[in-house]
Design a protein with these regions (language model features):
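Glycine-rich, proline-tolerant flexible connector loops at the mouths of alpha/beta enzymes
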Residues: 13-34, 38, 53, 85, ...
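N-terminal beta1-alpha1-beta2 module of alpha/beta enzyme domains
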Residues: 1-41, 45-47, 142-145, 363
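Alpha-helix-loop-beta-strand connector modules within alpha/beta enzyme cores
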Residues: 25-49, 104, 342-358
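An alpha-helical appendage that flanks or caps ligand/catalytic pockets
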Residues: 99-135, 172-318, 356-363
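Internal, glycine-rich beta/alpha segment that forms the wall or movable "lid"
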Residues: 58-161, 166-177, 181-197
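Active-site mouth loops of central-metabolism enzymes
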Residues: 52-60, 141-151, 207-210, 295-307
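Structural preference for beta-strand elements that scaffold enzyme active sites
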Residues: 13, 44-51, 76-80, 146-148, ...
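Conserved, mostly hydrophobic/aromatic
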Residues: 6, 18, 38, 69, ...
Length: 363
């Protein structure tokens, strides 16, 4: 029902994350199974994983299933990729070394893109070797479906992918500028994606829309607390129970040596954020009271009436982003609460922004 309403409301795409046990929010661990159902319940809505955790997948299986989904949907597949974390790799019986994890991600991505865009696959690498392997299934979209990368604008732009940022509005304008500058530097000024699209960049927004600010905040607050708990506590408890010291402390936040450091970008283009703008963004329409904007795991939640959400949307549009990612169901929000929020957003807010950032939905 939610998926069908997203389509009828005019959303561009639906993005589905990949999470696995012991995470509590691992209720759709097989994205392709779920998205196959989506392909049959919709006719226009685009969809895709955001992201496939590539080190956990065999590239041939991904090539085949991506091709199946693109054909089942009539060419509506979008592909998000990422390396995930070494904790997930460990629980899946893989190496817990971050450099090995990164190398596996890079090679899997190379094989997948090669296989999707050629009739025959040839590859010789550290983890996989294929010689003159026929690619019997090919995606409808050439050379392959649109590509997305999450969290790191540097990696997205350098590799010619659309970008989705996880965080809050503070500093997002700097991320947008960084992405556009790097795209121009590495892809070329005015260069489109491999599919001929304008590169998109958006921010995940956890939304609750209600008739009044007070009602929205009342709904959002307990749901947000549950969401923050679900994100990290079960995995942390499992790590502590097993005595996995390599995943504790600073080591849990290490990045591969050859990867752009997304933490450094917090200070990039800081001149764009004047004191006045920062203060205004810290309290747009009183939204900081809605379960704590930006609190917990780098995420933020926006809760309010349609008029309050419109105020937030004005600031979002002003960042220069051209994609808006809305998450309507998270934490302990019920289906009824989610549908009401989605309905208000679709009828009271979206009509004002149909020529602004393209709307997408993420779960």
């Amino acid at each position: 029902m939610q998926i069908e309403r997203l389509e009828s409301a005019g959303f561009f795409s639906y993005h589905l994350a990949e999470h696995h046990t012991p995470a509590v929010h691992s209720l759709a661990p097989s994205q392709n199974v779920f998205l196959a159902a989506v392909s049959q319940r919709t006719t226009r809505l685009r969809f895709g994983p955001c992201v496939y955790v590539l080190p956990l997948h065999h590239p041939i299986r991904l090539i085949e299933e991506i091709s199946m989904l693109d054909n089942l949907s009539g060419g509506r597949m979008e592909i998000g990729v990422g390396r995930g974390g070494v904790i997930e790799a460990y629980f899946w019986g893989q190496e817990s070394d971050i450099e090995v994890n990164q190398a596996r991600y890079m090679e899997t991505l190379e094989v997948v893109l090669n296989g999707l865009s050629h009739d025959e696959l040839n590859h010789k690498g550290e983890f996989y070797n294929f010689e003159e392997l026929p690619m019997r299934l090919r995606p409808m979209q050439a050379p392959y479906p649109p590509m997305w990368y999450m969290r790191n604008v540097e990696t997205s732009a350098i590799n010619g992918m659309h970008s989705i940022i996880v965080g809050n509005l503070d500093g997002f304008e700097a991320n947008v500028k960084r992405y556009k500058d790097l795209w121009e530097q590495y892809q070329g000024k005015g260069r489109l994606t491999a599919q001929g699209e304008e590169p998109k960049i958006g921010l995940v927004n956890h939304l609750v829309v209600a008739e009044t600010d007070e009602e929205a905040i009342e709904i959002a607050t307990p749901a947000w607390e549950d969401y923050k708990w679900n994100l990290g506590i079960p995995r942390r408890l499992e790590v502590e129970k097993r005595g996995l010291t390599q995943f504790q402390g600073e080591n849990a936040r290490m990045r591969p040596a050859n990867q752009p450091d997304r933490e450094a970008r917090r200070d990039l283009y800081s001149e764009l954020e004047s004191t006045e703008v920062q203060q205004r963004r810290a309290n747009p329409g009183g939204l900081e009271h809605s379960a704590g904007r930006g609190a917990g795991a780098g995420f933020g939640v926006i809760a309010g009436s349609p008029d309050t959400i419109k105020e937030y949307m004005e600031e979002y549009v002003a960042t220069g982003a051209n994609y808006f990612v809305a998450s309507f169901q998270w934490g302990s929000l019920t289906h009824e609460q989610t549908m009401r929020s989605l309905e208000l957003f679709a009828t009271e807010i979206m009509p004002y922004y149909m020529d602004a950032p393209v709307p997408g939905s993420a779960v």
